Amino acid sequence: MAADIDLQGDRESELMHALATVRSRLAAASQAAGRNVGEIELLPISKFFPATDVAILSRLGCRSVGESRAQEASTKAAEFAELLGVSREEKSSIHWHMVGQIQRNKVRSLAQWAHTAHSIDSLQLVAALDRAVAAALAGGRREQPLQVYVQISLDGDISRGGVNVTAPGAVDRVCAQVEESKSLELVGLMGIPPLGWNPDQAFEQLRLEHRRVLRSHPDAIGLSAGMSNDFEIAVKHGSTCVRVGTALLGPSRLRSP
């Protein structure tokens, strides 16, 4: 199967060029913000792209990819492992991140393939994930706790995911439950600019909320913010993880109707 990757010279060239361009943008944004580019993770978003693209990204030095659909991610993680012919112990060569909204009926599957979840937004989801990850750990289906970002909703519209930041104590309650769990580890906060908001305004508000949360949860140092069109602004406001899809992989290839 590895030979199939070698035959994709054009695609590898595309991804190599795109990755260099995105890394250059990230380095420039870091320098402009007076930050070290090494403290900011570039997370390729591989949703709707094949496992062969993930294999190429891995060969180009990427160690994590993000997915937004649990079923697609589970299938792709298995395809990636088969494609490279790796053993179960070697599957960690790529860390799979869940960046989309998580349905509670998918947590058992997610607990087996996800290294990190960026979209934790309720006490019920924390409890369900804690149970599922604990079972996966006990059953030998994973080796480490699930890394967790708590997603916040800056405008209170929770239909798009996120804890309502305008509800007193809501964010702290979810963060506290993650910290009290047995199989989850709190990484930090994740946020997306609400529709119609100026990204600069949104990321500044996200930064302020992150600073507030850090006072009660000092280990929550991560800030997952910024995508293809606005990650430079997010870096200015303290993002430690930028989620880049289109600018890196191009228009989606596997989108289902």
Swiss-Prot record:
It comes from the Bacteria. GO terms for molecular function: pyridoxal phosphate binding. The modification N6-(pyridoxal phosphate)lysine is found at K47. SUPFAM superfamilies: PLP-binding barrel. The keyword Ribonucleoprotein does not apply. Keywords: Pyridoxal phosphate. Pyridoxal 5'-phosphate (PLP)-binding protein, which is involved in PLP homeostasis. Belongs to the pyridoxal phosphate-binding protein YggS/PROSC family. This is Pyridoxal phosphate homeostasis protein. The lineage of its organism: Bacteria, Bacillati, Actinomycetota, Actinomycetes, Mycobacteriales.
